[in-house]
């Protein structure tokens, strides 16, 4: 908007003229708009005498006449008009001078602060345009003076802040400060006039029109643009002092103008150019801290302290501006004179400023902390405080006493925090959790203050004061706890820590919908001969996925189909990932070629399904386009193939339907609702009659929605079975949950113990519909300090208890359990729960997702995001943009990848990810998924506790030991580095906090240096994929890791002078996987691991003597897997009585075993026997008939005699032993078809039934797929024979 109507009309006419001329570039138009905007402002000042006296109005009118001529002249000649404008402004420059009129002569009663700010805003806007121009051909390009103009722009903004501050704080009539406002107008106008007069710059002809002296004066104009004095006879500082003293006399009431305060603080600090004492230097430092932190203070805190801040700002301004007019005296004299003249005592007046600076810094930090915490954070802090004081003793010397007191205080609170974790649900629990939260927040503050001290980011006086306050606050918290005797009262009711997971495991058996299940089952098994889509739709939480999975796993259904495959789509999906998921189910994991393009995978899926009857489950479809993508892969050959599809949307269900109408899944009826609630709360038991009425009322309140019912059941199952408590739940639920499933989730979250809230919200960091690996989840929980230590139990065991508790509350769904011990291996969250976790985590400053299409920019909300505990990114560009704004973030979780970066080293790009990560100075967890390759490990981030990433290098820098907090190091290798041995520096053994080290095929870099080192990794629990070529190397590494629980390693012909040297593994070792790279070489050591439960040997040459001697050292072994093993002693294995007393699972795959002799009591506790590819084995020993614990035998690709013996065992187990739970699975892959054929026509597979059928004449690509499949599921010798026959036929 223009102030002057004539100029506005001229602007419109010029634009029309120029836009009709195709030769006029946009840059020229921008310059015209820029120039006219300045002229408009200059004319707006015509009522002020100074505008006429300095020539501003006259110059403006002449320039307008030139533009009028331009607007009527054709054709438009850019170079000519640029020269005309330049010459005209050159003439103006010769006549223009700084306004020297008196301020009194310029007083105009209606000059308001609003008017002043409007003018300054226009000038700022126009100068912003100039500093952003980098094109040397632009008319607005400033080649040599951009830095000076940026300083000018800063001064203008500060002046505007000052005007705004005075205007907002002044309760007197504004005319009292007219002198100040006129002064601001004159200075701003002069700045704008100087810049306007020097643009545009003529490229290459500057010197033609400017003499060297003029160029020098031009530069001088810019260099002197910092505001010095308004005129020779009047001091600008006197004007400022007068207005500040007027403000000081009466401070106005608080207003929501915190941005003004943060801006005005910068004004005095910019002008401290005179010599100052040390105290004044401190004042400048304090005002800088006040400026930097003030804008981050929440409005409520700001309003509460606004009057004090106003007073501090005014006093600081008075102190500084009073010094400007005093020159030529010594500093001490200056200060004395100033104190006497103005009644100031500088040291005494600095104290309130210091107090306000500290208060603002403290409040700004505290108010933006995450509101959900892990109780293990105090454990982490206590360890770090000791390390900090050792590593940074010089920096922290003056804090030694305070830190020791704080350490003692936190240690004294550890028993209380343990009580909070272990106590049951009772009336004191909420109060205790509040105290625990206060303690954790103090721990966050200590960490920040100590780091700020080390890095000299906060002044020493502030740090000392902050720590003293922390000590006082912790003392106060402890006193409150002791006063209420909460520890003693609660300890009486503390249950054993083993009862953390006391809630019965979630019963995954479906309840209700019996009529719906029967209807759908009939549609799947009967109906049309053609392909049919059975689609279900309905609102979230109805149980669509649960019902679909029930049908998909129903034996009476599955047995009628050759192939079964499923995929979960979700709102954001990858077409290729869906195809891969379906192919893995259809043909097996080992046969899927992930490197193929999506179109090739789609064609492979179609050919796989073409001749077979298939059952496909496509879950959670959001759009019709998903069905368009997938439907072409599902051929219809009139063999009653079926597809189950679930969606929230009726339109999608209808779009995908073929013959059957879409099924709208109904709500539960009242009977089903109560039946489900009762089942989830009481398991196989019945509800007490006293609770039945209130229980049925609660079930009815859940709105007949299954998800709501199971969530409420999770709440009830954790409470005392008393009517009083159930009434409380009913009252809290209210009536609104009928239409709001989030209300039920919110209630479930509300009653969670504080140590589980952070664990639950952390699920929000995972992508929708993703299966979550439990080992990885637990490692992350521990690294995030969610898990509170407990003497006598490992953190992993405690975390498993947390998980089982969440499962028992029906907040987490189990997707896979371990066959041997029943522990959860994988889980997922319902979409409704996942959405809740993401939303609530953002509200609590706990977790923030930065998505590819993120609207909010980092600059708009820096501090709130800076304080989030965790950030999840889905795009590398987001990571770059946000890194500078998130220095205090504790975790960076990268959940997707830009294809440009996937699988490639970032060092070759314009920026490196390691350099970007250095901005996250408090980073504790770095979890990079999907093959994001880091160019180097960020060894400067010493807070890091968890790293998971991909690397391409074949070595790790020795500086890795700088990460002295690191507990988990997971480095995957890119395809380019696969197979190469990675060299691990000896400094890794100095990283004594390491708990998990996972690196494919690594070896110590300097074994001699490692041998000399006395350091050990006593905390290391899992070690994956070291590579050994000598027994001595293995022994050395095992000595360095005495507390290992899991070990996976690769060996190559370990040489040792004695054939059966005993290799002593750590006493706590529970899982061992040994793989030999050179297949069928003898194993040169005997395994001794007294507590080993899981042993897997692959690629070795073994005999009965070796296995017998090894078994003597493995009396607690529960799982034994022998893969690709060559048996000596004429391919015979003798198992004597008592060799494997605790063995539960025995798997033999592709072993050259011919004769198997087993004593009657060799496997007294065996539950599962799996034989795959044992084509030389004659039979399964008959003693397996009498093993009463046996539940399962699987035979795949073995001789008929083995199959027959398995069937005999089944008959005896079921009929004679009455073992009704016994199962026999026979899997057959017909390799012999390939040996007798002269050609091949077609290939089909059924991995569900484990059948392979091959006929004649197909192309070589399909044959190659079959061969790859055989290599994964069949015996190696026969596959090689098949390959040779195919080569001879010219097919490979």
Curated annotation (Swiss-Prot):
ATP binds at residues 538-545. Residues 394-414, 505-526 form a coiled coil. One of its GO terms (molecular function) is metal ion binding. The keyword ATP-binding applies. Confers resistance to late blight (Phytophthora infestans) races carrying the avirulence gene Avr1. Resistance proteins guard the plant against pathogens that contain an appropriate avirulence protein via an indirect interaction with this avirulence protein. That triggers a defense system including the hypersensitive response, which restricts the pathogen growth. It comes from the Eukaryota. Residues 505-792 form the NB-ARC domain. It comes from Solanum demissum. GO terms for biological process: plant-type hypersensitive response. GO terms for cellular component: cytoplasm; membrane. Residues 1211-1278 form the HMA domain. Keywords: ATP-binding, Coiled coil, Cytoplasm, Hypersensitive response, Leucine-rich repeat, Membrane, Nucleotide-binding, Plant defense, Repeat. Pfam families: NB-ARC, NB-LRR, WH_DRP. It is found in: Cytoplasm; Membrane. This protein is encoded by the haplotype C genome of the allohexaploid Solanum demissum. The gene is R1C-3. PANTHER family: AAA+ ATPASE DOMAIN-CONTAINING PROTEIN, DISEASE RESISTANCE PROTEIN RP. InterPro entries: Apaf_helical, Disease_R_plants, HMA_dom, LRR_dom_sf, NB-ARC, P-loop_NTPase, R1A-like_N, RX-like_CC. PROSITE patterns: HMA_2. This is Putative late blight resistance protein homolog R1C-3. CDD domains: RX-CC_like. Belongs to the disease resistance NB-LRR family. LRR repeats lie at residues 842-865, 920-944, 963-991, 1066-1089, 1094-1113, 1114-1142, 1163-1187. SUPFAM superfamilies: L domain-like (SSF52058), P-loop containing nucleoside triphosphate hydrolases (SSF52540).
